[in-house]
């Protein structure tokens, strides 16, 4: 029953789906678009440049983006490792990576949504202070109390 409904939706006739016989985009248009020239029947006049600009961006921006991805992947492995082996090294690693990950994420929100030079500088300064206090607070909690891993385990036991 479900297959017959699916065949009606997909336009199956004689064992072949309708979308397999009907091209969505004509190859000539794609070829012309990639070569940067308009084709017959192409009404768009906007050009999209696929090659990277040598004038925009820098090596530092590329390294920053790579660093963000490394920290995100590191967190994916660090959280289960902290659950399986709670120790002070895991606590301090979590404190550093969570603070850095949060700092970069909220920094992007500030960059995207806070407008005006003075306001944006003040927001970024406030974020830097907040991140420093967050890291210091987590380190203080790790040193003087049970630590992040054991605190989460205690919350789960409630």
Curated annotation (Swiss-Prot):
Positions contributing to heme b binding: 101
Annotated metabolic or biological route of this protein: Carbohydrate metabolism; tricarboxylic acid cycle
Record InterPro entries: CybS (IPR007992), SQR/QFR_C/D (IPR034804)
Residues in compartment: Mitochondrial intermembrane: 85-89, 142-158
SUPFAM superfamilies: Fumarate reductase respiratory complex transmembrane subunits (SSF81343)
Keyword Protein transport annotated: no
Mitochondrial matrix side: 56-62, 111-119
Any one GO BP annotation for this protein: mitochondrial electron transport, succinate to ubiquinone
Entry binding sites for a ubiquinone: 113
Keywords on record: Electron transport, Heme, Iron, Membrane, Metal-binding, Mitochondrion, Mitochondrion inner membrane, Transit peptide, Transmembrane, Transmembrane helix, Transport, Tricarboxylic acid cycle
CDD domains: SQR_TypeC_CybS (cd03496)
Protein name per Swiss-Prot or TrEMBL: Succinate dehydrogenase [ubiquinone] cytochrome b small subunit, mitochondrial
Annotated membrane topology: Multi-pass membrane protein
Membrane-spanning ranges: 63-84, 90-110, 120-141
Cellular component aspect of the GO annotation: mitochondrial inner membrane; respiratory chain complex II (succinate dehydrogenase)
Transit peptide range per the UniProt entry: 1-55
Subcellular location: Mitochondrion inner membrane
Functional summary from the UniProt entry: Membrane-anchoring subunit of succinate dehydrogenase (SDH) that is involved in complex II of the mitochondrial electron transport chain and is responsible for transferring electrons from succinate to ubiquinone (coenzyme Q). SDH also oxidizes malate to the non-canonical enol form of oxaloacetate, enol-oxaloacetate. Enol-oxaloacetate, which is a potent inhibitor of the succinate dehydrogenase activity, is further isomerized into keto-oxaloacetate.
Similarity remark: Belongs to the CybS family.
